[in-house]
């Protein structure tokens, strides 16, 4: 094996085994001895505690004043209903919170798919059972879903919201992490004559709101960004000149024509007065689909072109448009 003894081996992704749509095994090798546990434990902790996601935070059920009561015609008690709501997998697009409505009557199970919502909300597990109705009972509830990170118990919010919270609004312990299970294993690896290397195998499962492969990618990005501070350590006694960063990425200031979309897609955007890429990325999928003559095929094209440039729909740009563009318009 060539190279200096002081140089570290650079690992590579050997295999990504998608066991199911929500579970994957990722193999990374070769790693220097000990680095398997170092990286595996760091990624595991980030995936469990620091990944952003959505969770139910508040619930209102007609006829229910507190969580220790029961609802006539509902097989489960209120506490069990709240526990089932914790298993609701929701994806929000272009917003950080949403209030969902559920109205169901008649005997039978009440499913997550029975929840009414707008186009910016996606119920990922519509077959998830929330409760069971008996007889001709009717159930009506309002469910608040928020984006967050980590685990936030209801008790931490109850003290601060006690005075303003209406009677009957039930607070729920919120686990925002989209990762439901993760483990890692370190095995031996070999490169030429070296047999003391590590192979890291990460086995993880999500609630379906994020692809397992994408979750690992994001956790690695979070870890790298945190470590950047150590890479950029400087002598504090030396003044550091601050570089003036442009307010917006230059690509956002370019006209939409630079994306080289098909004539149909380009004309649809011009008809909506979407002149710059910065204008486009702030639109959501739902908003674009309301554009006359712009169908799902054109929407897919726009998303793919933006993705190739590291952009996406539904982005938020503070202080847009900049003065340079506003003056032109």
UniProtKB/Swiss-Prot annotation:
Q: Where is this region: Alpha N-terminal domain (alpha-NTD)?
A: 1-234
Q: Name one Pfam family in it.
A: RNA_pol_A_CTD
Instruction: Provide the Gene Ontology terms for cellular component.
Output: cytoplasm; DNA-directed RNA polymerase complex
GO molecular function list = DNA binding; DNA-directed RNA polymerase activity; protein dimerization activity
Q: Which cysteines are joined by disulfide bonds?
A: none
Record key words, sorted = DNA-directed RNA polymerase, Nucleotidyltransferase, Transcription, Transferase
This protein's record includes keyword Isomerase = no
Name the Gene Ontology biological process terms. DNA-templated transcription
For this protein, the Enzyme Commission number is: 2.7.7.6
- Extract the Gene3D superfamilies matched here: 5' to 3' exonuclease, C-terminal subdomain (1.10.150.20), DNA-directed RNA polymerase, insert domain (2.170.120.12), RNA polymerase, RBP11-like subunit (3.30.1360.10)
Q: What class of enzyme is it?
A: transferase
Instruction: Provide the residue span(s) of the region labelled Alpha C-terminal domain (alpha-CTD).
Output: 248-329
Reaction equations catalysed: RNA(n) + a ribonucleoside 5'-triphosphate = RNA(n+1) + diphosphate
Domain notes for this protein: The N-terminal domain is essential for RNAP assembly and basal transcription, whereas the C-terminal domain is involved in interaction with transcriptional regulators and with upstream promoter elements.
> Family per UniProt?
Belongs to the RNA polymerase alpha chain family.
Assembly and partners are described as: Homodimer. The RNAP catalytic core consists of 2 alpha, 1 beta, 1 beta' and 1 omega subunit. When a sigma factor is associated with the core the holoenzyme is formed, which can initiate transcription.
Q: What is the role of this chain?
A: DNA-dependent RNA polymerase catalyzes the transcription of DNA into RNA using the four ribonucleoside triphosphates as substrates.
* Protein name per its UniProtKB record: DNA-directed RNA polymerase subunit alpha
């Amino acid at each position: 094996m060539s190279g200096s003894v002081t140089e570290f081996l650079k690992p590579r992704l050997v295999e990504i085994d998608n066991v199911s749509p929500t579970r994957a095994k990722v193999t990374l090798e070769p790693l220097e001895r000990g680095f398997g546990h170092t990286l595996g434990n760091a990624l595991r902790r980030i995936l469990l505690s620091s990944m952003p996601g959505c969770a139910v935070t508040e619930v209102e059920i007609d006829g229910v004043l507190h969580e220790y009561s029961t609802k006539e015609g509902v097989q489960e008690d209120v506490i069990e209903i709240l526990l089932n709501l914790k298993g609701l997998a929701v994806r929000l697009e272009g917003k950080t919170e949403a209030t969902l409505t559920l109205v169901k009557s008649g005997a039978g199970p009440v499913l997550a798919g029975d929840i009414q919502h707008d186009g910016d909300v996606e119920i990922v597990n519509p077959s998830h059972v929330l409760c069971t109705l008996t007889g001709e009972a009717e159930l009506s509830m309002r469910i608040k879903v928020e984006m967050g990170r980590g685990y936030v118990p209801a008790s931490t919010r109850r003290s601060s919201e006690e005075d303003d919270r209406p009677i009957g609004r039930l607070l729920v312990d919120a686990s925002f992490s989209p990762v439901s299970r993760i483990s890692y294993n370190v095995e031996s690896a070999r490169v030429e004559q070296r047999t003391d290397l590590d192979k890291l195998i990460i086995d993880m499962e999500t609630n379906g709101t994020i692809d397992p492969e994408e979750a690992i990618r994001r956790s690695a990005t979070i870890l790298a960004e945190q470590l950047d501070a150590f890479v950029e350590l400087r002598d504090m006694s030396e003044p550091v000149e601050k570089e003036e960063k442009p307010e917006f990425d230059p690509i956002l200031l370019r006209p939409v024509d630079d994306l080289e979309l098909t004539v149909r897609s380009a004309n649809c955007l011009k008809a909506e007065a979407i002149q710059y890429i910065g204008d486009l990325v702030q639109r959501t999928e739902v908003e674009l689909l309301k554009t006359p003559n712009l169908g799902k095929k054109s929407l897919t094209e726009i998303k793919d072109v933006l993705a190739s440039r590291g952009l996406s729909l539904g982005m938020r740009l503070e202080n847009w448009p900049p003065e340079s563009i506003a003056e032109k318009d």
